[in-house]
Regions:
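Surface-exposed, low-hydrophobicity beta-strand/loop segments enriched in small/polar/acidic residues
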Residues: 1-123
Length: 123
């Protein structure tokens, strides 16, 4: 781990390109963006990383009280549970993980919305 701050944010080395607001997970000692609802997200990128080796600040899920902005991967209803790929959780009782609840709606992929975050868990 590269650096820890007092507010639950850490800086980590990116394993590839990451956009601001994307959920990230560990992979080979670095962080990469989550691409599946079953990915074990550790946080949300607070800034983007253009390429592998770049340093990216990450808000660690569940490590502080508050909210964080995510980049939606599709439409999300206000109040919906959000998966690590940035989508609305729609399949109750599956292996999809839930990492937060949308505090505002996203109309389409790419929208930045605020979520109340939590350590990822199943229903």
């Amino acid at each position: 781990m590269d650096k820890r701050s007092e507010n639950g944010n850490i800086t980590l080395t990116a394993g590839g390109a990451i956009a601001k607001g994307e959920f990230v997970k560990f992979s080979a000692g670095k962080v990469v963006k989550c691409t599946a609802a079953t990915d074990a997200a550790i946080g949300v990128a607070l800034d983007g990383a253009a390429a592998a080796g770049d340093i990216v600040p990450v808000a660690v899920l569940g490590s502080f009280t508050g909210t964080v902005q995510i980049k939606a991967a599709g439409a999300i209803a206000q109040g919906a549970e959000v998966t690590p790929e940035g989508k609305e959780q729609t399949s109750a009782g599956t292996t999809e993980l839930i990492c937060g609840r949308a505090l505002e709606a996203a109309a389409a992929a790419g929208d930045m919305i605020e979520i109340a975050h939590a350590v990822c868990h199943t229903k």
